[in-house]
């Protein structure tokens, strides 16, 4: 098993591995090109994103600056929006569903380091995958830690630090992030009424 295979499977691996470094630098070059042209040449920026990401649906919008490690381990669905300063450390797979919105400075970290300093000082790292369901809104300055799953239809309050997985259909917030309540029919009625009033 090579270092890339170890990395993607969640085993300890050497991030300094030459093949991984080549992939990392290639991704950084694409990220730099994307950030430079995102507002001046949308077609070129979209093409760069298609080359950078592992897969991407339709209607993808990422505000620069954007940062990631490899890009190829990031899969996003349709109608994805990420605001400024999004950071995705994708040493493992990051699966993002459709109709997902990320506020400014949202960080998704699959990367982790050993607690034992002797192992850590050898340059060994590991990762855990992250998944985000459909119709999720993650507020600004949220940190999603390695191995987290966020269920579909969830709303995450700004400034949250997610250390445990979040179920679907809830509002969650805090440091550490905790479920505050379920999203219910009253929420739907309220926001549909707001939408109706807007059209008057």
Where are these regions (language model features)?
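Terminal amphipathic alpha-helical/low-complexity segments used for targeting or macromolecular assembly
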Residues: 1-59, 177-200
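Short secondary-structure boundary/capping segments
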Residues: 4-5, 52, 98, 122, ...
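Flexible, glycine/small-residue-enriched loop-and-beta-strand segment within the central core
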Residues: 39, 66-76, 81-149, 175-176, ...
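Short conserved AdoMet
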Residues: 54-57, 133, 149, 167
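Short-chain dehydrogenase/reductase
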Residues: 137, 155, 171-173
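Beta-rich strand-turn-strand
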Residues: 139-165
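A contiguous, mid-protein "functional segment" used to position or interact
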Residues: 161-182
